[in-house]
Amino acid sequence: MEIEIYLGILLEGKAHLFIRESSGLIKQVSFLDVVMLNIGNMSAGLALFTSITPYVLPGSNLLIATLIAFLLALPQAYVYTYFITKIPRTGGDYVWISRMLNGGIGAIMALTLMIESLAYFALTAFFASQAIQLVLSEIGKLNGNYALINIGNVLIQPIPSFILAFAAFAIIIGINIAKAKWGYSLITILGLFSLAATIIAIGIILANVSDFVAKTSAMITAMGGKVANYQGPTFSWGATLFMLPFLAMFTFPWMQAGPAVSAEIKGKRALRYNVYVSLILTFILVLAGYGVMYCAGGYNFTTAQYINNGYIYNFWTAAIWLSNSQLLQWLIGLGLIAWEFFILAYGAIVFSRYIFALAFDRVLPSIFAHVTRKGSPIYTHILDLLATGFFLGVIVFLGSQNALALYGAIVLGTLYFLVVGIAGIWHSIKTRDIRLLLASLMTAGYFTYLTYISATNPDFGFMQSDGIVNPITLTFVVGTLVFSVAVYLAAYFYNKRRGVDLNLIYKEIPPE
């Protein structure tokens, strides 16, 4: 009751402070749409590809690490579910932080998250060509089709990778500009296809348990690797917990997509359950994917190949190799590729909503709050395309290996979620909500740890193995923070000269 009264007070009066009295966005996002949006955000399919398994250590158990990462994500899911049901507004956690904690902090952190996300989307788009090359190369070798192998080798070159990435993202942006609902439909189609391909791949691996080791050994050799023998313990708590941050940073905590579009979600049931359903489905997919690899190959063989052939031997390559028909090979290969573009499709929507929310609060130019009759924030999408194109150009300029350092900016993502936890703590103290307080304390504590790990573990790119901060990553992270602060201060003083106080805006919940 207290929060309803609190929100009622905030919503009274000064609606003129915002760009307009209604967002103009349309409530057209179904339960299925928002669940698929969240699953794309959590990227279960890529957790089964090469984002995690190459970092396995002797004694690591990915099943236990996945379970722990899932359990530790539950408090964060509670915090997000609490706020999405109480304050269902475009921009999600940005709105919560800026209203419950501090407007300036909320705006600055949202800007840093969006810039970090742009770099991540550009890297995902650029390196999607590696997934395509791997699929074409493997299917080509399985069927003696050297044309496919040659095409794959061409696509992996910098300029073709840039063209492919930019063209794919431009198509996704174009669909979203044409009609907002089409953007969500694209998410749902890619999501359902990706999930179906993953389930089929699980079935194929289970159907080949009897000769899995022999067949995948042949695959490793054919793909240029050397089959490794395992020497190490069958289990180590230290090695298992070492894998926890990889799952925590690349998969489970990314649950802000649904909340970011919460003003467009139809029905209270979808608002209340979308985060939990997405989290549970992601957990099941990741656990099943790792589980069938252990089941079919055994712990020793699978761990040895993850350590020594991690970019050849994984869930997807094994499933393609074991498929007994080209149709299945292509289905699974396209499923992997779909996961890559699934991320880009969700990113196009989520980025636009954060920028829209910032513009609605007058932090960014009002043009970014313009919505077409079809419900599309057109200019935020155009900004997204241009900015992603810029980062793609940076990747080509730096070289793909140097550009990998941009992944180190994930420290900004973990820092952002830490601030969400702090906002939850502050609000729970004011409203005397014990359950929210406990969940927020656990969330803040967890992301304090993850922020430290992302800044100190060389595997995450911010810190190098010699103990020196990567200069590319440091420049990007510091530059992002400085730029975000500068944008907020410029907006604050610009609006103040025009008689609008941003502090007053942040005392109100924005209209739907």
Feature names for model-found ranges:
Residues 1-60, 73-78, 222-225, 229, ...:
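Membrane-interface "cap" regions at the ends of multi-pass membrane proteins
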Residues 3, 62, 66, 144-152, ...:
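Helix-loop-helix junctions that connect adjacent transmembrane segments
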Residues 21-27, 92, 178-189, 253-289, ...:
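Hydrophobic, small-residue-rich membrane helices and short re-entrant helix-turn-helix hairpins
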Residues 51-52, 64, 201-203, 207-208, ...:
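A generic transmembrane alpha-helix motif of multi-pass inner-membrane proteins
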Residues 52-66, 149-157, 181-190, 331-336, ...:
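Transmembrane helix-loop boundary segments of multi-pass membrane transporters
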Residues 54, 75-82, 86, 90-169, ...:
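Hydrophobic transmembrane alpha-helices that form the core helical bundles
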Residues 95-98, 102, 276-345, 364-410:
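TM-loop-TM module centered on a large, flexible mid-protein loop between adjacent transmembrane helices
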Residues 162-219, 274-281, 410-419, 431-445, ...:
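Membrane-interface loop-to-helix entry segments
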